[in-house]
């Protein structure tokens, strides 16, 4: 599943004439499931790792996980802080379907949004399901 999501992200960026390498990507949701702060075994970590390995600059936003806790598997990510959602990113990747994201208005966002949960109500022009 993570490899498929990465391929959709790659295609979305390619549609803009951009490569993954050097692109700024925002992952929405670090928690394992919606509206909780438990990020153990979250697929978002795998997505972050794969995107970083491809040379992307990756940040995340999660209202329930303001700072990445120390874990054995992802110790190098510990302490990274959640950032605000804004239009400075090349791509937004929704990984966890928090209520905040379902109702967030992405319709005016200039960058593509890849939705792995098929939950965004106010979609941008450049919208991809993964």
Where are these regions (language model features)?
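Structural/interface elements that position substrates and couple domains in central-metabolism enzymes
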Residues: 1-130
